[in-house]
Every structure is written in C-alpha cells, then in structure tokens.
C-alpha cells in the first residue's frame, strides 16, 4: 500500500484533467488499484480526480443535504462516462433511524439508486484514530470492521452487511424501548 497525498496548494488548477489521466494511466500500470479521494464539492479538484477514473465509490451520510449533493455527484460521474458507481453510507446511527430522525440505508439506496457497497456506523473511534494518526482497518471497532468489509467487497468478495443494531449496547436498546414517542 502506497499513499500519495494531494498537494495542499491554493492553486487547484496547477494540474489539469489531461495531466491527471496521464498520471493515473501510469499508476495503473504499476498497481492493482489506484484510489483517489475526491475533495468535497464539484470544483477543479473533483474534475481532476474523476478524469482518469473507471469506477467511483460515492460516500454520503444519511442526511437530506448530503444525499442531494451525492445525487448531483452521481449525475456528474455519469455525464463523464463513469458508470460503475457504488454507494457507501457513512455515520449511520441506528438509534436515530429507529426514532425516525435519520433516513435508513434502504431509503438512501432507494433515492440514489446505486448498489450499496458499504455501511459505516457513526463511531467515535474514527475521530480518536484520526487524531492519533492510527488506522481503523483491522481494529476491533464497528467502523474498522465496516471499512474492512468495504475493502473485501471492492475486491469482489461477497461479505454480509453488519447488523448495526448489534453495536448498540443492551442498556441503550432497553432505554430505546421506554423512550419511544
């Protein structure tokens, strides 16, 4: 695994899409997978990142504004002839879904009409690991297991989706029974 971070310059036009296509083509000759993390939004950084892509993983949260943005991104990907698009739903909170305060993964999939490749629960361990510079993949956390499962699915393995309700403690579930509206 090699990681090449993006440049942190103010000038996002220092590399154009044709240069990205050339660079990605060169990298594809050397690696099995070349994964580009797109910046949020649809500006030049996004256009550069998708220039050489043959597949996309759209990551969204189950919030109305995020789903609208994801839908816009999907349209742009399709307009740029990227048709292998999968969906990752991030920061899911089963307790909020049960209360009706958050869309379910099924609702998000219905709205965006993409195959689901990953469900990542909201997990404070993500913040802790990020701040400590530690990876979560391979860790004994719900999010770490979810990331590992996404990796397996990208590789073509059939892996069942985790039951996110199991990640909620017994007392939280009991409490939820008595706090229904």
Question: Language model features by range: what are they?
Answer:
Residues 1-29, 128-132, 136-137:
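P-loop/Walker-type NTP enzyme "switch/lid" segment
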Residues 15, 68, 103, 138, ...:
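Conserved active-site and cofactor/substrate-binding residues in soluble primary-metabolism enzymes
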Residues 18, 22, 26-29, 33-128:
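Conserved catalytic-core segment of NTP-binding enzymes
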Residues 132-181:
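NTP-binding/hydrolysis catalytic cores, primarily Walker-type P-loop NTPases
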């Amino acid at each position: 695994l090699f990681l090449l971070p993006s440049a942190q310059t103010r000038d996002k036009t220092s590399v154009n899409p044709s240069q990205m296509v050339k660079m990605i083509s060169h990298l594809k000759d050397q690696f099995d997978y070349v994964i580009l993390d797109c910046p949020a939004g649809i500006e030049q950084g996004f256009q550069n990142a998708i220039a050489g892509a043959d597949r996309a993983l759209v990551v969204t949260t189950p919030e109305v504004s995020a789903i609208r943005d994801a839908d816009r991104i999907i349209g742009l990907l399709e307009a740029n002839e990227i048709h292998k698009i999968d969906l990752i739903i991030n920061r899911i909170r089963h307790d909020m879904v049960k209360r009706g305060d958050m869309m379910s993964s099924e609702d998000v999939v219905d709205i965006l009409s993409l195959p689901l490749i990953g469900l990542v629960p909201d997990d404070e361990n993500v913040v802790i690991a990020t701040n400590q510079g530690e990876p979560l993949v391979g860790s004994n956390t719900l999010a770490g297991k979810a990331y590992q499962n996404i990796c397996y699915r990208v590789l073509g393995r059939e892996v069942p989706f985790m039951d996110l309700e199991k990640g909620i403690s017994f007392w939280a579930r009991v409490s939820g029974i008595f706090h229904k509206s």
